[in-house]
């Protein structure tokens, strides 16, 4: 057990500091913005320091763990802890949230509440990724929903209330199944709740009950990932939300579902995962094709990028279902890669739409000359998203490919069919992304309009884009830097999986 509560400080600091926003002097929005950015930077620096000096990469066990009694009557403990599986998403959360705060600079209406909600969301997400207690995991899952709902309903497009209501209905419905699974696993076989991950990992369940638990958790995660057909909230939400909120949704929120699928379903319920894994692979394969095909028909720029996110998450689902070291490492790599790429694409789409006051692709065209910097950055991230070699998207999808090909779970013919369909999806990806670039930046449609909104990207947009582009290139050139974080933990999960 850690003697200094590093993780407690990391989880509590953003929301605690966020409460102070309401007591800042009323001297305009600039004070609130700089205060929030400083809090995010301090949190990111603290995380980096703790993980560099107090985390051992070659140790697959839980590290920096803490255990404090919280509610005695329920035997509920505050149990944070991290391992190789959680350190990547936590660092991604800190990085993307800091940049999303900078991206939210133009927000002026209710600025204090907006930035407090971003910091509250920050704490909820880090708390979830560092939880090693089932009930704490559920509480952090719910804590993160409230700020997202308010961010969606108060800042965004004309249909923001509709999209926010749809989001909360889907996620709250999934949370019911998550709570039932948590309580079922915690109360099984004992008069006292056993909510600790380590205790639950050593618990044996009847196969039928394990399948029931697995299915309940899967529904909750299928909403967040999302898995078709529980994905319809995502395009509407992205289409109406402010682009800084979209960065948090695409960069972090979707990753929570995949993280829970590995952390709870795969690690704690291995027999049920073995039964469900072929269906996960099938769902992921169909999702790649369906979402890519649907994205091609979208005329709303943000919705097209949203469907591309759904398609790319299909590779993560396939990697998790492959039950191989390579496949699971590829799924984790795809999570981090898409976290960067999804956030960058929504940021650039939002800044572009703010400048030209248009959102529909058939109304755009010809803005590459007046906005060359945005054109260059948008094209670069689109190339990374369509898996151009040398960038993170290519490495992640290639590793998932090798994972499913080398899987012992599937026969030769199904593996050939799966890889063939995945290849079709990878062909559709450049079609809808390149056609999107053509509709936005090429042609002559907007040349005759006034150029009052055609100011190219400034230092803020360039800084955010370059900060995201560096890890995209870094992962593409040297993926072992990221894979080294999770490889030992992945081996530990799969060794327990096969020998239990």
From Swiss-Prot:
Alphabetically ordered keywords of this record: Chloroplast, Membrane, NAD, NADP, Plastid, Plastoquinone, Quinone, Thylakoid, Translocase, Transmembrane, Transmembrane helix
First-level EC class: translocase
Subcellular localization(s) per the UniProt record: Plastid, Chloroplast thylakoid membrane
Residues that span the membrane, as ranges: 4-24, 37-57, 87-107, 113-130, 134-154, 167-187, 211-231, 242-262, 272-292, 305-325, 330-350, 386-406, 416-436, 462-482
Known EC number: 7.1.1.-
GO cellular component: chloroplast thylakoid membrane
GO molecular function: NADH dehydrogenase (ubiquinone) activity; ubiquinone binding
Membrane-protein topology: Multi-pass membrane protein
Any Pfam family matching the protein: Proton_antipo_M
Biological-process GO terms, alphabetical: ATP synthesis coupled electron transport; electron transport coupled proton transport
Coiled-coil regions listed in the entry: none
Family matches, as InterPro entries: NADH_Q_OxRdtase_chain4 (IPR022997), NADH_Q_OxRdtase_chainM/4 (IPR010227), NADH_UbQ_OxRdtase (IPR003918), ND/Mrp_TM (IPR001750)
Catalysis performed (reactions): a plastoquinone + NADH + (n+1) H(+)(in) = a plastoquinol + NAD(+) + n H(+)(out); a plastoquinone + NADPH + (n+1) H(+)(in) = a plastoquinol + NADP(+) + n H(+)(out)
Family annotation (HAMAP family): NDH1_NuoM (MF_00491)
The name this protein goes by in its record: NAD(P)H-quinone oxidoreductase chain 4, chloroplastic
Gene: ndhD
């Amino acid at each position: 057990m850690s003697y200094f509560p590093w993780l407690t400080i990391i989880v509590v600091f953003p929301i605690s500091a966020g409460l102070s926003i309401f007591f800042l002097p009323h001297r305009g929005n600039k004070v609130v913005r700089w205060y929030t950015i400083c809090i995010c930077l301090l949190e990111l620096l603290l995380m980096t320091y703790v993980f560099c000096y107090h985390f051992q990469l070659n140790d697959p066990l839980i590290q920096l763990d803490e255990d404090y009694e919280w509610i005695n009557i329920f035997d509920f403990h505050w149990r944070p802890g991290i391992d190789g599986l959680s350190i990547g998403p936590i660092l991604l959360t800190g990085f993307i949230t800091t940049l999303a705060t900078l991206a939210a600079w133009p927000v002026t209406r209710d600025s204090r509440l907006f930035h407090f909600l971003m910091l509250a969301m920050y704490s909820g997400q880090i708390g979830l990724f560092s939880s090693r207690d089932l009930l704490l995991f559920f509480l952090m899952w719910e804590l993160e929903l409230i700020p997202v709902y308010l961010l969606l309903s108060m800042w965004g497009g004309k249909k923001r209330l509709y999209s926010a209501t749809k989001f909360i209905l889907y996620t709250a419905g999934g949370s019911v199944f998550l709570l039932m699974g948590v309580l079922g696993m915690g109360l099984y076989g004992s008069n006292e709740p056993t909510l600790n991950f380590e205790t639950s990992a050593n618990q044996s369940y009847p196969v039928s009950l394990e399948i029931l638990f697995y299915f309940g958790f899967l529904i909750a995660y299928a909403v967040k990932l999302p898995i078709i057909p529980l994905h319809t909230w995502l395009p509407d939400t992205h289409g109406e939300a402010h682009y800084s909120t979209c960065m948090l949704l695409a960069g972090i929120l979707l990753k929570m579902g995949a993280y829970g699928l590995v952390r709870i379903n795969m690690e704690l319920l291995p027999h049920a995962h073995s039964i469900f894994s072929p269906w996960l692979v099938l769902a992921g394969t169909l999702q790649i094709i369906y979402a890519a095909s649907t994205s091609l028909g979208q005329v709303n720029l943000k919705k097209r990028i949203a469907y591309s996110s759904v398609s790319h998450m299909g590779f993560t689902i396939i990697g998790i279902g492959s039950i191989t070291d390579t496949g699971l490492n590829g799924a984790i790599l795809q999570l981090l890669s898409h976290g960067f790429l999804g956030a960058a694409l929504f940021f650039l789409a939002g800044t572009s739409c703010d400048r030209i006051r248009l959102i529909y692709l058939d109304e755009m065209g010809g803005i590459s000359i007046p906005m060359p910097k945005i054109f260059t950055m948008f094209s670069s991230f689109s190339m990374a998203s369509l898996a151009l070699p040398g960038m993170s998207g290519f490495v992640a999808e290639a590793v998932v490919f090798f994972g499913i090909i080398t899987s012992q779970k599937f026969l030769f013919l199904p593996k050939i069919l799966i890889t063939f369909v995945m290849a079709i999806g990878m062909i559709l990806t450049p079609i809808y992304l390149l056609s999107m670039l053509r509709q936005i930046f090429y042609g002559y449609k907007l040349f005759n309009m006034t150029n009052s909104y055609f100011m190219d990207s400034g230092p803020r947009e360039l800084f955010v884009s370059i900060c995201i582009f560096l890890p995209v290139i870094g992962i593409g050139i040297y993926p072992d830097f990221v894979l080294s974080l999770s490889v030992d933990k992945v081996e530990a999960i799969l060794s327990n999986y096969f020998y239990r």
